[in-house]
């Protein structure tokens, strides 16, 4: 995949459409709970949050207020297999999180996060994706952040 949540957003959209068309009257919270059983990040897309810190496999969604960012996305012609990236993460890279650093990161706006932390610190999946797809290093440019399980990178565009 590209690491932009395409499959997850499609799944969440289907759940919302089914809820509406079948008159199920499920709440957003109920849709998020179903989404967490469907796949990674489906809960986030079902939440309708504009900005959120997402953890676990996307089932923990903590919203926050932040102005929309002007970003640029680059997707190299490398298809990263989401399941394999997560499996490699669990096998080789899973470690206990530094809770002090996590709290610091939660308190910062996105622009500061990108300025102050490395690609590896911002996305735990970058290292396992690199292990599986070493050619990603050709595209890991300064100022660009790895998106999801890959293969896209994004950066915050300078205001002009």
Could you tell me what each predicted segment is?
Residues 1, 152-154:
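Short, active-site-adjacent cap segments at secondary-structure transitions
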Residues 2-30, 46:
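DPxDG-like acidic metal-binding loop motif
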Residues 6-7, 146-151:
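Glycine-rich beta-strand-to-loop/alpha-helix junction loops that act as flexible
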Residues 25-33, 97-99, 144-147:
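Short, surface-exposed acidic
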Residues 45-143, 156-160:
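Conserved, helical-rich catalytic subdomain that frames metal- and/or nucleotide-binding sites
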